[in-house]
Regions:
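Short sequence motifs at beta-strands and strand-loop junctions characteristic
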Residues: 78-80, 107, 134-136, 170-172, ...
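Transmembrane beta-strand segments that form the barrel wall of outer-membrane beta-barrel proteins
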Residues: 67-77, 94-105, 111-115, 123-134, ...
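Outer-membrane beta-barrel initiation region
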Residues: 35-110, 272-274
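Short, charge-rich amphipathic segments
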Residues: 70-81, 173-177, 202-207
């Protein structure tokens, strides 16, 4: 979300250099040195004396979630303005970390870093997340899925320090989340949940209905319908709806969202993005 308040931002040139240097450092750590081949290597065992590796029966798009790194570039359009966001994230076992830069030529410029931990045991799935930015903004959340079968409950809570912030979720930041999900197959699933404000007394709530579906072996799609209600900054009560599309390939993706009254403001935002998985 974007909340505009007077802040001292970093210089644009320094902002660009920080992003570039960070990308170089992160990408360099992902490249492992080639292993040397021993001159005294023993002959490989025959097929009769070893178990051959079984081929993965899943389709390429079903394996796409297993890539450890993701680089996303987004452009956000509102009337008379355009903003840009670059996000690099990498998974380290159960931990995921990211660094991102947001640039609005007319106002906001900031960097943000974050991390989350993915814990699964039996019927319990917990994902705590923490993110901080160069505007001294902080955001923390705890997401959970409860259930051992195909159908599960969704519950979560999020909190910020109310400083100027920008994130990629576009829902109330100081909120509680409640919902339900159902796994149709290894890839397909449907979810419905509501995220509602519990701190600022705005009565803001966003209800999402998500449907993820495999089109064929190499393509998948997620549709995200959102229904909004609540008071905006002006006090006006808003009721509206938006839609998003996420198109998934094995090693890349694109997404497009139409978001009227973004963050319960008076204007509409269109968000477009493209990314790589590696």
């Amino acid at each position: 979300m974007i909340r505009r308040r007077p802040e001292k931002y970093i210089d644009v040139t320094l902002f660009v250099r920080m992003i570039f240097l960070t990308l170089v450092l992160v990408l360099s750590t992902l490249t492992a040195p080639a292993q040397q081949t021993s001159s005294n290597a023993q002959p490989s065992p025959s097929p009769d004396s070893s178990t051959a590796k079984q081929p993965d029966p899943r389709d390429p798009v079903e394996r796409s979630d297993e890539f450890k790194s993701k680089l996303t570039f987004g452009i956000y359009f509102i009337p008379g303005e355009r903003a840009y966001d670059l996000n690099l994230r990498h998974q380290f076992g159960q931990w995921t970390a990211w660094i991102a830069g947001f640039y609005d030529p007319k106002s906001n410029k900031l960097l943000r870093v974050g991390a989350q931990y993915d814990y699964k045991k039996g019927w319990l799935h917990l994902v705590p997340t923490l993110e901080v930015s160069t505007t001294r903004a902080m955001s923390g959340s705890l997401y959970s899925e409860l259930g051992s079968g195909k159908t599960y409950a969704i519950a979560g809570i999020a909190r910020t320090n109310l400083r100027p912030f920008f994130d990629l979720f576009w829902d109330p930041g100081d909120s509680v989340q409640l919902g339900i999900g159902h796994k149709i197959s290894n890839y397909d699933r449907i979810q419905g949940y509501t995220i509602f404000d519990v701190r600022l007394h705005t009565e803001q709530q966003n209800t999402h209905v998500l449907w993820r579906h495999k089109l064929n072996a190499n393509n998948g799609i997620t549709l995200d319908a959102v229904f909004k209600s609540g008071h905006g900054d002006s006090g006006k009560f808003i009721r509206t709806a938006g839609i998003g599309v996420y198109y998934d390939r094995e090693k890349w993706f694109w997404k497009l969202y139409f978001d009227p009254h973004v963050n319960f403001a008076d204007h509409t935002m269109v968000r477009a993005g493209i990314g790589l998985k590696f």
